[in-house]
Each structure stands twice: as structure tokens, then as C-alpha cells.
Amino acid sequence: MPMADHPATPAVVLAGGLAQRMGGGDKPLREIAGRSLLARVIDRLAPQCDTLALNANGDPARFAGFGLPVIADPVDGFPGPLAGVLAGLDWIAAHRPDAEWMLSAPADCPFLPSDLVVRLHQARLDQQADIAVAASAGRSHPVIALWPCRLQIDLRRALLADDIRKVDRFTARYPRAIVEWPVQPFDPFFNANTPEDVAEAERIALRDSR
């Protein structure tokens, strides 16, 4: 499926986590090879998505340099990535009511594949799925997913009424397509959770730029 053939797809970049394994602070602003994690994620997604928004809590001014709308969790208490997905769906309903699909991706995955959106769309069509989820090395990455915007109301109910916090618990309610990517020369869904991961991301970025 050529990129122009799939529906226009906005994306929400999830940066609402507490970065506890990184010692707190704004993990998306950590630099690898002279460029922040968030900037690298934007670089990867901008050619694939027609609109980007950033889900982050706290003072939005710290992300002003990226030129993205910053949207906070609509649910109190840092309830996890599902709240960020809901924030994205709420924002799209208000600002892109024409959109039928939304991509979600975390702000700490700097090597997202260039065919992410097109392959997720193809898989959900081929498998008649409601949600398409990325995977690598036999493991799914539930926050890197293609969501139908019509799940906005269901997701709000799951968070507020059913107290569901884990992404897999919510997505298990719907037909899912799991889309596997190769991990050579590196895992495109490598995420920088710890200082050691950041060091490894530096090595990958330098190798990838040669």
C-alpha cells in the first residue's frame, strides 16, 4: 500500500510518563548523538503522519521549541499510556474531526521505521482488525499502534468506569493485527528507558548515520 493510498493519519507522541528508570525529568529531551529523543521521533513520524500532537503533563512551555500542540492527560494521577492515547483521541475529535485513525508512539523510541503507518494500515485491512500493533523479536509493543478514532468513548469508559490501566487489557477487547518488523541491523522499536539504553541508542544513531 503506497503511503498516499492509506487514510490521512494524525499521530500522538506519548511523553506523559514519569521517567522513573531515568531518574525522573524529561526523558524525551535527553540527547543522543546531538539530537533529542523527541526530535528523532518527530523526524521519523512527520513524513508518515499529516498531523502530530504531543501528550505531556506539566508545563507545556518546555516543549515549545518543537512546534507541536501539547495535550495533557485527561485523567488525573498519571494512569499510564492509555490516558495519553485518550488525550490524542480527544484532541483529534476537536481539531481533526475528519480523521478516522490515529497512530500512537512513545517519545523514547528514536528509530521508528519509515514504513510504520503504511504497514499498520495494510495489516488492519488484510486482517479486518480494529487495532494494529507493532511487534519485533516476537514481542508486541502495544503503545505503538494504529487506533480507530471511534474508540474514544469506549476508552474513556474503560479508564474512568472500568479502571483499566494496561494497554493490552483494553486492546484485547477488539480484533487486533500484530505486525512484525525485523530487528536487523537494529530493533526499530528500541526504547531508551535507562541511562544504559541512552548510551546504546548513541551507538546505534552513530552507526546508522554512516
From Swiss-Prot:
Instruction: Please report which protein family the annotation says this sequence is part of.
Output: Belongs to the MobA family.
Quickly give the catalysed reaction: Mo-molybdopterin + GTP + H(+) = Mo-molybdopterin guanine dinucleotide + diphosphate
Q: Does the keyword DNA damage apply?
A: no
Q: Report what the protein is called.
A: Molybdenum cofactor guanylyltransferase
Binding-site residues for GTP, renumbered to this chain:
L14, A15, G16, K27, N55, D73, D108
InterPro entries attached here? MobA-like_NTP_Trfase, Molybde_CF_guanTrfase, Nucleotide-diphossugar_trans
Q: Where in the cell is it found?
A: Cytoplasm
One GO biological-process annotation of the entry reads: bis(molybdopterin guanine dinucleotide)molybdenum biosynthetic process
Question: Do you know which PANTHER family this protein is assigned to?
Answer: MOLYBDENUM COFACTOR GUANYLYLTRANSFERASE (PTHR19136:SF81)
What is the purpose of this protein?
Transfers a GMP moiety from GTP to Mo-molybdopterin (Mo-MPT) cofactor (Moco or molybdenum cofactor) to form Mo-molybdopterin guanine dinucleotide (Mo-MGD) cofactor.
Q: What is its main location?
A: cytoplasm
Q: Which UniProt keywords apply?
A: Cytoplasm, GTP-binding, Magnesium, Metal-binding, Molybdenum cofactor biosynthesis, Nucleotide-binding, Transferase
Q: Relay the domain remarks.
A: The N-terminal domain determines nucleotide recognition and specific binding, while the C-terminal domain determines the specific binding to the target protein.
Q: Quaternary arrangement and interactors, per the entry?
A: Monomer.
Determine the domain of life of the protein's source.
Bacteria
Q: What is its EC number?
A: 2.7.7.77
List residues binding Mg(2+). D108
The molecular function GO annotations come to: GTP binding; metal ion binding; molybdenum cofactor guanylyltransferase activity
| Xref: HAMAP family | MobA (MF_00316)
Q: Which organism is it from?
A: Rhodopseudomonas palustris (strain BisB5)
Cofactor(s) needed for function: Mg(2+)
